[in-house]
């Protein structure tokens, strides 16, 4: 299965479909497990790149069976996706930079493990992103407008690792959080912090009943309740009801 690496800057890519099926537990040609960051279908590290009407998918399967499997790995600056579809399960979309250090030795094995952690900004408009566990993750500043986030299994939409000194992490405005077939009510969360200063803000979004009444999860990191930056403004739908976790700032 070919992987696509896009390194050219200042380009527009339209009407393309990229499909792959590599996964973290797969044995790499070098004899080691492939790992998360070598499982991508597409890696784009060019700057000022726009994708329009493109499809990115990783069909390896559920995370419980294959581990992480990236459809799209972004590590350029000022990348925009318009009217695109992303499909996967665990870790569908990675938005660089990586955190400074891995928790598990070798956890960042891949094309960017030793590169400088540069601040990145990404924009998504009118996109559909499907996944299960932590399916949008990373340390970037990313804006999602009029997008649909489809939870295809129980899990978490966002897993931010926003650096402490970066004010804005992931922002979703006028988006829809919906459930795939057979996803139970209350079985999914908007976000959980991959690192202690993770930042997510959702604004005027529709939340289906699969979103748990707590809204956000702390990933067992009670020490991070005072450092995470989870903000919710003007949510609608069944998933907007109930008492939010006490580390979430809700603005009516």
Explain the meaning of each model-derived region.
Residues 1-252:
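Sequence-level preference for short, compositionally simple segments enriched
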């Amino acid at each position: 299965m070919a992987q696509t690496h896009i390194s050219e800057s200042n380009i527009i890519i339209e009407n393309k479909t990229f499909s792959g099926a590599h996964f973290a537990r797969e044995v790499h040609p070098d004899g080691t497990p492939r790992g998360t960051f070598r499982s991508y279908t597409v890696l784009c590290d060019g700057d000022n790149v726009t994708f329009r009407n493109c499809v990115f998918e990783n069909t390896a399967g559920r995370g419980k069976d294959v581990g992480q499997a990236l459809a799209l790995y972004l590590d350029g600056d000022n990348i925009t996706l318009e009217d695109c579809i992303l499909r996967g399960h665990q870790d569908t979309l990675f938005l660089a930079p990586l955190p400074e250090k891995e928790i598990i030795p070798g956890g960042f094995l891949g094309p960017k493990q030793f590169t400088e952690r540069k601040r990145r900004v990404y924009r998504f408009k009118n996109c559909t992103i499907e996944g299960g566990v932590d399916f949008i993750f990373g340390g970037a500043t990313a804006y999602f407008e009029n997008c649909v986030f489809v939870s295809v299994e129980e899990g978490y939409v966002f897993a931010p690792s926003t650096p402490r000194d970066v004010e804005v992490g992931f922002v979703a405005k006028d988006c829809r959080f919906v459930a795939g077939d057979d996803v139970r009510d209350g079985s999914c969360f908007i976000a959980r912090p991959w690192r202690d200063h993770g930042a997510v803000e959702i604004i005027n979004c529709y939340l289906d009943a699969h979103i748990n009444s707590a809204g956000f999860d702390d990933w067992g990191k009670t020490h991070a309740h005072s450092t995470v930056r989870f903000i919710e403004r003007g949510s609608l739908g069944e998933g907007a009801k109930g008492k939010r976790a006490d580390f979430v700032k809700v603005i009516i």
